[in-house]
Each structure stands twice: as C-alpha cells, then as structure tokens.
C-alpha cells in the first residue's frame, strides 16, 4: 500500500518500534513528523534516515503527557507539511 503524498505523525518515533514504524511509512512514501522525549542524537539519526528515503520529515521534542507539546506536534505536521493523514500513538515509558 502506498502512502505517497500523505503525512504521518508518530509519537515516540526516534527509537525502537516507533522508529521502525517511521521508516516503514517513509518507505511507502509518507512524509513523517515524529515526536521524541529527549534523546536528540537518536532523533537526529532517525530524521536523517527518513530524509535519505526521499520524504519530508520533522522531529519535534516533547512529551505526549503535555498538551502544549502535542499541539506543537500536530501544528508542525499541518503547517509545515500541509496535512495530517495518519496518526500512530506509539509513545511509552521505558523503565
């Protein structure tokens, strides 16, 4: 299934399952906006991998427990990439 021209938002997208979801969406043509809690190096590495697949991508730092951060995430997708077509709520707590 192709997602070309669609914009996906993935919470917790810089590592683990979230990263894998971001990469698969990008392989299928989706532009990807993802959130990350605090590991800037992991977020930057994921962003570069997504760009190498030829899609537009944005990494937005913030917690999904913070309504203002969630608004920023959604606003980034809509304002910078034009829409929000796919939402993957993946963020979790690593203990």
Identify the residue ranges that each predicted region occupies.
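The beta1-alpha1 cofactor-binding region of Rossmann-like NAD(H)/NADP(H)-dependent oxidoreductases
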Residues: 40-41, 61-75
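Conserved glycine-rich Rossmann-like NAD(P)H-binding loop of the short-chain dehydrogenase/reductase
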Residues: 28-45
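A glycine-rich helix->loop->beta "capping" turn
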Residues: 3-4, 53-56, 75-89, 95
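Aromatic pocket-lining residues of Rossmann-like dinucleotide-binding sites
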Residues: 25
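Conserved Rossmann-like nucleotide-binding pocket used by diverse enzymes
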Residues: 9, 33, 58-60, 80, ...
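Short, conserved SAM-binding/catalytic segment
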Residues: 46-54
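Conserved glycine-rich cofactor-binding loop
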Residues: 7, 12-16
């Amino acid at each position: 299934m192709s997602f070309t021209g669609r914009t996906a938002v993935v919470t917790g997208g810089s590592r683990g399952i979230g990263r894998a979801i971001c990469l698969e969406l990008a392989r299928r043509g989706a532009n990807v906006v993802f959130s990350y809690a605090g590991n800037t190096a992991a977020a930057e590495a994921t962003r570069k991998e997504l760009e190498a697949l030829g899609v537009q991508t944005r990494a937005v730092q913030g917690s999904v427990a913070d309504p203002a951060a969630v608004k920023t995430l959604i606003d980034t997708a809509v304002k910078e990439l034009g829409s929000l077509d796919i939402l993957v709520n993946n963020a979790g707590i690593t203990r």
